[in-house]
Structures are given as C-alpha cells and as structure tokens.
C-alpha cells in the first residue's frame, strides 16, 4: 500500500488513508495567481491556453490572492514592485507555494546589474520551484508545475495541519 496509496478492494470500494487522500486533493487543486512582470508572462499565458491547458492538472487561475495557494512570478522584479509582491504573498492562504519563472525572476537575468532590479524573487518570498529559461517555454513551466505537484504530494504528514486534534 506504500507504493500505491489507493487500493481497489474486491467489492468495488477504494481504500486509502486520510493522509493519502489529503495529499491527492492538495496536489490536484492548486489555484494559482499570476504575477506577470515581463515577457515570461506571455509564455505563462500559452501554458494556460488550450494547447497545454493547466486546468486539466487542477490548476485554476484566480484573481484574488486570498483564493490562491500558488503564485507564479514571471519576469523582472524591481525594487519598487518587491513590497507589493510581498504584500500579495502575505495575503495568500496557507499552505502557499511560489514558482519562479524565467531568468529574471530567478536571479535578475539580463538586468542583473541594474540598480533597480531585485536579483531573484527568492530574496523577497520563499520559492519552491525554479523554472529556468529566457523566456522559459510553456512546456518548461508545465514541467515545473508538475514538479511542484509532486512536492506537494510528498510533504510529510507532520507539516500538514491536524484535522482531528485532541484538546
């Protein structure tokens, strides 16, 4: 049962543990908010379009950070935009995840030596998955999001909130 968390019994019932069911639900229901700052946002739109269709992975775009648990940062983060990004991140519900998309979001990119650029969004918010490229392709973003889904499913049960805790 460790290799396959869902087991089909002879009577047609699916037997699993609560942890495996919670992991599957969290993995397949990541609602994301786009934080498109530059040209990488165009590739993010391609990934959300009909050809790659992020909805089939359970990833639905939301406009409000209070409804999201995933932020995709795409593009050059400037010093002026950094406090706004942190404020939006703080408004997101727990557990929250961040995907850094593109060279500019990962480490400053082409504008690394500019006085007005933050050299990586991980200096402002904790990043879970980095997607390299300038700009990264839609396939690379989808692969990065699949890696995030794997990471969400493999979280330990100790880091999840307790549903039925004794007082």
From Swiss-Prot:
NCBIfam families: nuoB_fam, PRK06411.1. Binds 1 [4Fe-4S] cluster. InterPro entries: NADH_UbQ_OxRdtase-like_20kDa, NADH_UQ_OxRdtase_20Kd_su. It catalyses: a quinone + NADH + 5 H(+)(in) = a quinol + NAD(+) + 4 H(+)(out). The keyword Lyase does not apply. Its cofactor is [4Fe-4S] cluster. One of its GO terms (cellular component) is plasma membrane. Keywords: 4Fe-4S, Cell inner membrane, Cell membrane, Iron, Iron-sulfur, Membrane, Metal-binding, NAD, Quinone, Translocase, Transport, Ubiquinone. NDH-1 is composed of 14 different subunits. Subunits NuoB, C, D, E, F, and G constitute the peripheral sector of the complex. HAMAP family: NDH1_NuoB (MF_01356). [4Fe-4S] cluster binds at residues 39-40, 104, 134. It is found in: Cell inner membrane. Signal peptide: none annotated. The keyword Metal-binding applies. This is NADH-quinone oxidoreductase subunit B 2. The gene is nuoB2. One of its GO terms (biological process) is electron transport coupled proton transport. Its EC number is 7.1.1.-. SUPFAM superfamilies: HydA/Nqo6-like. Transmembrane segments: none annotated. NDH-1 shuttles electrons from NADH, via FMN and iron-sulfur (Fe-S) centers, to quinones in the respiratory chain. Couples the redox reaction to proton translocation (for every two electrons transferred, four hydrogen ions are translocated across the cytoplasmic membrane), and thus conserves the redox energy in a proton gradient.
